[in-house]
Amino acid sequence: MSIKKLDYWLIESLMDTDLYKITMLQAYYHAPEFRLVDIEWKFACRNRNGLDLSILIPEIFRQLEHLCTLSFSDAELDYLAGFSFIKPDFIEFLRIFRLDMRFVHIEAKGEDISLRFSGPLLHVSLLEIYTLAIISELHTFVNCGGIDLKVARERLAEKIAYLKAEDDLSGFSFADFGTRRRASKAWHEEVLLTLKEQLPASFSGTSSLHFARTLGLPPIGTMAHEWFQSWQAVTRLADAQKAALEGWVQEYRGRLGIALTDCYSMDSFIRDFSDPYFGKLYDGLRHDSGCPFVWAEKAILMYQQMGIDPLSKTLVFSDGLNFPRMLEIWKRFKGRAKISFGIGTNLTNDVGNVPLNIVIKMIAANGRPIAKISDEPGKSMCEDLGYLQYLASQYGIDPSLVKISQ
């Protein structure tokens, strides 16, 4: 079975990605450790459930070919240069930057998609978000028949009404983290415009650089798991998490200071982070797996034991959120720390269809495995169980508890 070519391009700007892809790319660009590092990334769909994704491959390939013709415009670069944390030499690198199809390998694996990126870290990292957004939107229009805007708008209105029904939302804020799994780019834009108008006090911004620029929203983001994983390739495994935290400090000098805690586990993160040097330099922490309530209690206790007032720090929650869950967490911890949220699929792909739970993760560097473990076993992604177990042992995690998953 083949599908009809779309008569439009799903990605029309290299800015149509998340802020943290650009901030991590700049950190890689400046760090001498990564100049000769080749990285392999792998796509996985965690809820295919018999769906034939292979029919999307020709159009994915065509859309990626178009993506590789794009470059940053002068206006886009001027926008990026306006941020104090983006440096002039990196702007000049972006001015000549192009993606390259030579690093893309895609084929059918039965009815599934076998998709990998393999090449120099600086030249393959940005492929992740664009590709996920392309696959997600193709799924919407090919497998789901499009978006029922009546249903989508009703669901968005219900979310907004749910928040407005609260008597006091002072101090409550959330941002859009939904670029990678959005139902469509057009729906993504409508969601952001609606939230900007309807919830100006609570809606804090978007991870999307494109929409931050075009809609006048604050861009939100710092680092992702790839930053922590990549350090496994260039330092001792037991030191990789500390090296990643220090590398970020050296690049951003206290700016963009929200640290992701679950590349290995929250407990191992606390072991490496519970030093006033990191505790005072970083503005806060981000939760992305495991129980958010247990995680937050551990974070607050860690700060207290360092002699740091938790109310001076921000705890960001971004794992599989919906609006009731956000309010539940906020009510539990408001007044104990600054609380913020990043919400993705439930915001940009709650349109009546079943969204794909898709990821593209680093799996190897310079031909050797790398991995994340997380606070949730089902979120591990690696092709070498022996390596995953050894990595766990280096971070105080029982190797028998980790497993390879998609």
UniProtKB/Swiss-Prot annotation:
Family as reported in the entry's similarity comment: Belongs to the NAPRTase family.
GO MF term list: nicotinate phosphoribosyltransferase activity
Entry PTM: Transiently phosphorylated on a His residue during the reaction cycle. Phosphorylation strongly increases the affinity for substrates and increases the rate of nicotinate D-ribonucleotide production. Dephosphorylation regenerates the low-affinity form of the enzyme, leading to product release.
Organism: Psychromonas ingrahamii (strain DSM 17664 / CCUG 51855 / 37)
GO biological process, any: NAD biosynthetic process via the salvage pathway
InterPro entries cross-referenced by the UniProt entry: N/Namide_PRibTrfase, NAPRTase_N, Nic_PRibTrfase, Nic_PRibTrfase-Fam, Nicotinate_pribotase-like_C
List of residues that carry Phosphohistidine: 225
Pathway: Cofactor biosynthesis; NAD(+) biosynthesis; nicotinate D-ribonucleotide from nicotinate: step 1/1
UniProt keyword annotations, A-Z: Ligase, Phosphoprotein, Pyridine nucleotide biosynthesis
Positions in coiled-coil regions: none
GO cellular component, one term: cytosol
Known function: Catalyzes the synthesis of beta-nicotinate D-ribonucleotide from nicotinate and 5-phospho-D-ribose 1-phosphate at the expense of ATP.
Protein name: Nicotinate phosphoribosyltransferase
Gene, per the UniProt record: pncB
Catalysed reaction, written as an equation: nicotinate + 5-phospho-alpha-D-ribose 1-diphosphate + ATP + H2O = nicotinate beta-D-ribonucleotide + ADP + phosphate + diphosphate
